[in-house]
A protein has these predicted regions:
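Blade-edge beta-strand/turn elements of extracellular beta-propeller
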Residues: 6-8, 56-70, 119-135, 183-197, ...
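Beta-rich accessory regions
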Residues: 233, 240, 247-249, 258-262, ...
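Blade-loop segments of beta-propeller domains
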Residues: 50, 56, 60-86
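Repeated scaffold domains used in trafficking and secretory/extracellular systems
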Residues: 202, 252-254
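Hydrophobic core segments of beta-strands in well-ordered, beta-rich domains
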Residues: 17-41, 62-63, 79-104, 111-113, ...
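Conserved small/polar residues in nucleotide/adenosyl-binding loops
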Residues: 1-7, 314-320
Length: 325
C-alpha cells in the first residue's frame, strides 16, 4: 500500500517565507519567498519564487519568477505584496527592500510594480510607485501592499501595513490606503484602520464572501497569529468575532486566494533557533494551507484541504494487523 506524506510544502534546502497567492480556473499560483538560511534568515537576497498546484499534493516548480534586483537597486530583496489580474494581464505590487539603503539612512522599503502576460515571466516598471511613506509615518515600516478593485466606487484600493511614528514600543500599527483609477497615479487617503492594538500589521488583505467583507492581517508580535475582522461595508466599521484567529500561535503571514471554487489560506509555520522548541521562532519555515469556509453567522472557519487529507490516508487500505493495531 502507498501513503502520502505531503501535508505541507517546503523545497529541499529552502525555508518558505511570505506567500502571495493567486487563484484562477482551479489552479493556484503560489508566489513565495525562499530563504536559504545562509548564514541565517535574510542572509541571501531573494525574489519571488513560483510553484503552481491544483490539489496541494503535487506542485510544479518554476524557480524564481519575479527576480530580485542588484545590491544597488531598491529591490535587493523582494518583500511581500500581492498579485491580481486585469484584462491586460497580471500585476504584482510589491515591497522592495535594500539593507544597504537602511545602513545609509535612506528609505529602505519602496513600493514597486511589475506586469506579466502569463504570471510566470515578469517585467518590472522602471520607476517606483508614487506611494512613499507619508509624513508622520515610520519610513522603515511601510510594506506589504494589497490591491483590489472597488466596484462601487469604480477605482482601485491599495492598503498596506504602516506605523505612526518611529517608537517600536507603541501600539501605533495601522493600515493606510491609497486609491487609483489607472494603477499608475495613486492618491493617499489616510488611515484605513487604526485600532491601536499592535505595533505593526503585516500582510493585510480584503475579500468578500457572501454579504460580508473580511479584513485579514498578521499581528507583528510574539504571538505570530493571523487574524480577521468583518464588516458589511468595504470601509468598515470592522468588528472582531469572538474567535478572530484562523489558527494558533506560530501560523503567520497568511493571505488567501480563490480559484473559482474554494478559498484557501496560505501561511507558514516557523522553525526555531537550533530546532529547539525552547528557543525563539525564526522567520520563515514550512508552508501549510487551510481551506476557508463561512459559517451561518458570517464568521469564518478553516479546515484541511480535502485533496491533501485524502492523500494523507492510505490509498490502498488493508485490514488492521492485530499485532500492530
Amino acid at each position: 500500500r502507498q501513503m502520502c506524506i505531503r501535508d505541507s510544502y517546503q523545497p529541499e534546502g529552502i525555508w518558505v517565507g511570505d506567500i502571495m497567492p493567486y487563484g484562477k480556473e482551479g489552479q493556484f499560483y503560489v508566489y513565495h519567498q525562499r530563504d536559504t538560511r545562509n548564514p541565517g534568515p535574510f542572509g541571501e537576497p531573494f525574489g519571488w519564487a513560483l510553484a503552481t498546484t491544483k490539489d496541494f499534493v503535487d506542485y510544479k516548480d518554476y524557480g524564481e519568477s519575479l527576480k530580485r534586483g542588484t545590491d544597488e537597486e531598491a529591490d535587493q530583496f523582494i518583500y511581500a505584496g500581492s498579485v491580481f489580474e486585469t484584462e491586460a494581464g497580471f500585476h504584482a505590487f510589491y515591497t522592495g527592500y535594500n539593507r544597504e539603503f537602511l545602513k545609509a539612512g535612506k528609505t529602505s522599503q519602496t513600493l514597486l510594480h511589475a506586469t506579466s502576460k502569463d504570471g510566470i515571466t515578469w517585467e518590472k516598471s522602471k520607476e517606483a510607485l508614487e506611494i512613499p511613506p507619508q509624513e508622520g509615518y515610520d519610513k522603515r515600516n511601510w510594506r506589504d501592499p494589497f490591491v483590489l478593485w472597488d466596484e462601487e466606487r469604480e477605482e482601485y484600493l491599495l492598503i498596506l501595513g504602516a506605523r505612526k511614528g518611529e517608537d517600536k514600543r507603541k501600539q501605533t500599527g495601522r493600515l493606510v490606503h491609497f486609491t487609483s483609477k489607472d494603477l499608475k497615479k495613486w492618491e493617499f487617503k489616510g488611515d484605513f484602520w487604526a485600532p491601536g492594538i499592535y505595533t505593526m500589521f503585516e500582510m493585510p488583505e480584503i475579500f468578500k464572501m457572501g454579504d460580508w467583507w473580511y479584513l485579514v492581517f498578521s499581528e507583528y508580535s510574539d504571538g505570530n497569529k493571523i487574524h480577521y475582522r468583518r464588516s458589511k461595508n468595504l470601509y468598515g466599521p470592522w468588528e472582531a468575532p469572538f474567535d478572530d484567529a484562523f489558527d494558533g500561535k506560530a501560523y503567520y503571514a497568511g493571505r488567501t486566494a480563490f480559484d473559482g471554487e474554494r478559498r484557501v489560506l496560505f501561511g507558514w509555520v516557523p522553525t526555531r533557533i537550533d530546532n529547539d522548541d525552547k528557543n525563539a521562532y525564526l522567520w520563515g519555515g514550512t508552508f501549510v494551507p487551510h481551506e476557508v469556509f463561512q459559517k451561518e453567522d458570517g464568521t469564518l472557519g478553516v479546515k484541511p484541504v480535502d485533496q491533501m487529507m485524502d492523500c494523507l490516508l492510505y490509498t490502498s487500505p488493508s485490514p488492521r494487523d492485530p499485532k500492530t493495531s
